[in-house]
Amino acid sequence: MNKDNVKLAIAPIGWTNDDMPELGSENTFQQIVSEMALAGFTGSEVGSKYPRDPAVLKPMLDIRGIQICNAWFSTFFANGQREKTIDEFVNHMNFLHAMGAKVIGCSEQSGSIQGLDKPILGDAKPCFSDEEWQRVAEGYNTLGRLAAEKGMQVCLHHHMGTGIQTTAEIDKFMSLVDERVFLLFDTGHAWYSEGGEAPMLAILKKYLPRINHVHLKDVRPPVIDQVRRDGLSFLDGVKKGTFTVPGDGVIDFRPVFKLLDDFGYKGWMVVEAEQDPALANPFEYAVKARKYIRETAGI
């Protein structure tokens, strides 16, 4: 890949999990960002332990050569929380803008079961009605316009347990929104949802022109099989090791890197692989991911 086009980041979720704060609660902010830099990454997404005052956060990252590239934002358009979502988005956007980020990764969380004690591989996830889809599309088009006014871009993070998880749901969303709304492509969630590498790559191929942010996440199929067999929740699966870093699971990332490179992708690739840090030392796994990417992507 072209190192002038692609930058590498890593998310703090491998060190401490915002959905399960007990995982990695002992890992401090300064330890997290220091280990990111030591492992060879130049970017980070934002976690709950990060100071939210840019005047405090930026110098602490600058000294380590780390730049903020994105931060998760939850939207609730389908269930009618338009005004509240937009107000909170503006504050979130202004923070990211102050930090120099260009991308705002969003997830439509109306009815999401990702944090609930419900089987993640079943029929418990939300399925939006036509009216709800319209609310989502109109909401995201508004966010896209607001972001563009700041020189930024909004992208939708397809995610397990949400109303925009499957290939069909991604297709529906992308057909309804305008050109100012992009897709955050997540290898792990695509593989997990669709059950393999071929459908994962099909999503990537189809939406290359609309992808502005990439999450690199590997999966462990034996754990996914257990999640399916035992009716486990998303978070139970995470604790058992559903996800891991690139090079440690089943996904061959070389076709992913080739597709992005051939298209001329410009932006961040983010190692975003949540697992229990007590079982998978975050620094060791960050180093493992960085080595794998260097060997397979050439950057």
Swiss-Prot record:
GO BP field: inositol catabolic process
Family of the protein in this entry: Belongs to the IolE/MocC family.
Keywords: Cobalt, Lyase, Manganese
The keyword Lyase appears for this protein: yes
Pfam family, one: AP_endonuc_2
Reactions catalysed: scyllo-inosose = 3D-3,5/4-trihydroxycyclohexane-1,2-dione + H2O
InterPro entries: IolE (IPR023952), IolE/MocC (IPR030823), IolE/XylAMocC-like (IPR050312), Xyl_isomerase-like_sf (IPR036237), Xyl_isomerase-like_TIM-brl (IPR013022)
EC numbers, comma separated: 4.2.1.44
GO molecular function: manganese ion binding; myo-inosose-2 dehydratase activity
Cofactor(s) it depends on: glutathione; Co(2+); Mn(2+)
Gene3D superfamilies recorded: Divalent-metal-dependent TIM barrel enzymes
Protein name: Inosose dehydratase
